[in-house]
Structures are given as C-alpha cells and as structure tokens.
UniProtKB/Swiss-Prot annotation:
Substrate binds at residues 298-304. It comes from Nostoc sp. (strain PCC 7120 / SAG 25.82 / UTEX 2576). GTP binds at residues 12-18, 40-42, 304, 330-332, 412-414. This is Adenylosuccinate synthetase. HAMAP family: Adenylosucc_synth (MF_00011).
Amino acid sequence: MANVIVIGAQWGDEGKGKITDLLSRSADVVVRYQGGVNAGHTIVVKGQTFKLHLIPSGILYPDTECMIGCGTVIDPQVLIKELDQLESLNISTKNLLISETAHVTMPYHRLIDKASEERRGSHKIGTTGRGIGPTYADKSERTGIRVLDLMDPAALRDQLEWTINNKNVILEKLYNLPPLDTEEVIQEYIGYAERLRPHVVDTSLKIYDAIQRRRNILFEGAQGTLLDLDHGTYPYVTSSNPVAGGACVGTGLGPTMIDRVIGVSKAYTTRVGEGPFPTELHGELGELLCDRGAEFGTTTGRKRRCGWFDAVIGRYAVRINGMDCMAITKLDVLDELEEIQVCIAYEIDGDRCDHFPTSARQFARCRPIYKTVPGWQVPTSECRTLEDLPQQALDYLKFLAELMEVPIAIVSLGASRDQTIIVEDPIHGPKRALLHPDGTPASLLSA
C-alpha cells in the first residue's frame, strides 16, 4: 500500500495529467485535492485526446475510484459537461465521488473575477477569469456555498437570496454590471444538484476507509509549486495550495499517512500569465520551444511563456514538497537544439543567489547564471528505455538530477502513454533517499 502525492514543480502545465494517468494503472484511488476549472490536464490514449479540468485522470481506468476532495472548488456546469463528454465516449463515471464539503463556483464569482482583473489595469495578475479566486475568497469569508448546500434546495434558496442580493450591489455599484436574477440562478443550480447527487459523499471518510484497507491512493494536485498561494511568486499565484501539504488539508489525509511525493517538471520551463520568469526566452528560441511543445493552455488557450530549465526553483520545489523523486516531461522538445542552457543560480544586484527569493520584486531582479551543456540533435520520441536515449540526453537528465538532489523515476518523451521511460515505479518501487550513504547525489543512473 502507498499513499502518493503528485505535484507540479514549476508554474503548472508540467504534464501532471499524463504522469497521474500512467500511475493510475497502479492506483486503486485517485484524488484531486485543490484548485478548480482554472487548471486542465490533457491525456492522450490510443490517439484519442481527453481534456479534463475537474475530474481526476484516473477516470479512464474502469476499476479506479476517483474523488474530488474538499479543497477543490467545483463549477457544476463544467463538471457536468465533463461527465457528459466521458459518458458519450462510453467511459463510465460511476466511480466518481465528490466531496460534500467542497465549495461551489457561482455565476457571480465568474463575473467578479473578470471585472476585477479588468479593473486592475497594469496591475493584473493573469487570472483565468473562471471565478476561482472569488470562490476561495467567499470560503475564507464563510459566505460560500458548499456542495452539501447545493443538495438541499431550501438551504440553497435561503443562502442564495441573501448572497446574490449582496453580490448584486458589488456588480452594479463597483463594476457597472447588470444584476443577477436570483430565482434564475437558484433554479439553475437546483438542476445541477440533481445531476450530481449520486456522486456526492463524505470523501474524507472514503479516503480513510481506503487507507484502512491498504489500497494504493494517488493524490493529484493542480497548477504548480510556484503558483502556491503561500509558497509561490505572490501575488502572481493561484488561490489555493498546490504543494504537497495541500493534499492533507484538501482531502482530510493525515500528514503521517503520506508515503512519498513525486514532482513533475518539464525539461525546460514554462509560465502562463503575469509574473517574473528569470529564464524566459524571447525571439526564435522561445518560439521554437513553444511550437515544438505545443505550449498553449488547456483551460484558456493562452500562449505559454517558455524558457530554460531553472534548477533554483527546482531545488525550492524539492524542499517545499519533500520530494522523493521526479518525473521529467517533454524531453523530446529539446531534440533539435545544438546547445542547452540550465540555470544553476541567480545574480541579484551583483551578488550570487542560490536560493529562490520570496519577494516577487526581488525575484524580478534575478538574472540567471547558466551552465551550457551539449544537445543531442537526435529524435527521442520513440525511445522506450534509458539505453535507447543518446548519451547527451542521458547526461542532461543526470545533470538535472544532480542539481535537484533527487532521483528521476520517469522520463516522458511525448503526449501518449507509451512515449514514456519508467526508470522506477514510484508506487511499488523501493523508496530511495535523496542522497547515497557516501553523500553523493542520487541520480536516475542509480536505478
């Protein structure tokens, strides 16, 4: 039995969906623990592409139980569309369970999110406009609607009559928007409740029962470490906690029950939206990475900013999450490059800095210190073992593992399930220490 957390080690979009999908083969339960429809994951199976925002990747395995935990915020409209899409493809959704204490995104959340971002002008933070921040804000203010409220028409009406009256004042007076029709919203969400009712349970109890039965549980985060509300590049962050610790709060998992943490990073770095990005590439190289990596957001379609691999934020992610091993994705995107650069440290105002600065203003002043390594200029997308990889690609992966001081367990070379090298099964394989007894960093070559 293993309880495994999969987290993003960069700014999201690292390929967690594919890695979670792969690991779901060995999992009995897959749990999404935070975020909402502001994140998406793409999975390619036998040439068929699935784009999901709320439903865990494990849904594609008929015997895997999938849960949406209490730390998520649920947009019923989007969730029902995902259910309908999967069922139209003859993929069963009977194993999907939804936390009754998760909060619900309402129409006023989306309206306020978009209007607030517009009002920020040059100070915008790059929100997706899906209402996630305002939903979490209402949760903190204790005025939110939870799934269990959605299941009780009388309670829902009582809460929404008061809440929409207050939100309409904000919409009209602050943003010059027309008010919402209270009765229309109530009836719309009562309809959603009936569609979702069979899936709603106390997921924390289900998770505890699964642990008692010694089942393998995979906890799936959205976004990435550098977008964490407390540990990311604030204020250019999301409104929840994608880090490994968020899995405990967002599901009811006790911290002593975590067996291992798997971090997912691209072989380079991307970021979508606003905020500092020291290794960002402009010009032809940035465009090359964007084109070869198909770097456009699953949720918004926005073009992602691309740059070299940043080992400073990588080490930070290892530390914050207590990572046991890494999955490196999109190695094949680098196939055409003669040389590759890796950021090993920063320079701030003339001084070397080996650690991630907690101030976004200070982070914006960071200039990357690069180590240049040779590329391989050989296609790797058909490689299926470490021995198939060109030596320069192996050397690159070993270099990343040494810089991060954590072993690499998985290498992804494309979007499909089969375009993967499993160095070590992170669920059933032996848990390795970050350093060997002789003090040298562990690397994928020690597998």
